[in-house]
Design a protein with these regions (language model features):
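Post-signal peptide N-terminal segment of secreted/secretory-pathway proteins
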Residues: 35-154, 160-163, 167
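Bacterial Sec-dependent N-terminal signal peptides
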Residues: 1-34
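TPR-adjacent "capping" and linker segments in tetratricopeptide-repeat scaffold/adaptor proteins
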Residues: 21-28, 122-141, 173-182
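Secondary-structure transition/capping residues
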Residues: 5-8, 42, 154, 173
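Generic macromolecular interface patches on structured domains
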Residues: 18, 77-78, 172
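Solenoidal tandem-repeat scaffolds enriched in leucines and small polar residues
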Residues: 155, 162-182
Length: 182
């Protein structure tokens, strides 16, 4: 009788896990569709952040990559609006850039902590480094923007992120502190 209960418990446990994985895949594919259509990006970001609240997903590369893709799409939409002189919430634009950097740093730290193979870590670092380096100047611009608006906390946060990202492992191979001209 005990053996049957244990077997039943194991079956229910596996069934619950498989349902959770199926729901996760469904949510990720739904978010990818939102990214393609470029609509409801705030909702897409919230879906991915809710997935990351579950400890089972914290080491899931797909969830982190999809969250980064959502933030990147929001950045690209804001950048396009600014370039075409369309109305854009500049505060939201700069805060989104900071979030993009924070997500990349957090994901990199989780990969290192999870003892993933160095080849896999380097591959994702290179992917993120190229994107982050092309937008890094906007951290500085955002910091100056917030300081001019007398929002010193946000300004300091963006400028601090601009400085510290140069020493982070994602971008450290580019030797930014040595290349900086004063």
């Amino acid at each position: 009788m005990k053996k049957i209960r244990i077997q039943l418990l194991i079956i229910l446990l596996f069934a619950g896990c498989s349902l959770s994985l199926m729901a996760q895949k469904k949510e990720i594919s739904q978010v990818k569709q939102m990214i393609k259509k470029s609509n409801n990006l705030n909702q897409a970001e919230q879906i991915m952040r809710d997935l990351l609240k579950d400890s089972a997903n914290i080491n899931n590369d797909k969830v982190w990559n999809t969250l980064f893709d959502v933030l990147n799409k929001k950045y690209l939409n804001g950048n396009e609006a600014l370039y075409l002189k369309r109305p854009c919430d500049t505060t939201l634009f700069y805060n989104n850039i900071a979030e993009m950097f924070k997500v990349a740093i957090c994901f990199d730290s989780i990969q290192v902590k999870a003892n993933k193979p160095q080849k896999e870590i380097n591959k994702s670092r290179e992917k993120y480094a190229n994107m982050l380096l092309s937008t890094r100047a906007n951290l500085f611009n955002g910091g100056v923007f917030f300081i001019r608006k007398k929002d010193y906390n946000n300004g300091f946060d963006l400028l601090s992120l601009y400085i510290t990202i140069a020493q982070h492992a994602i971008i450290s191979s580019y030797n930014l502190p040595q290349k900086a001209k004063y």
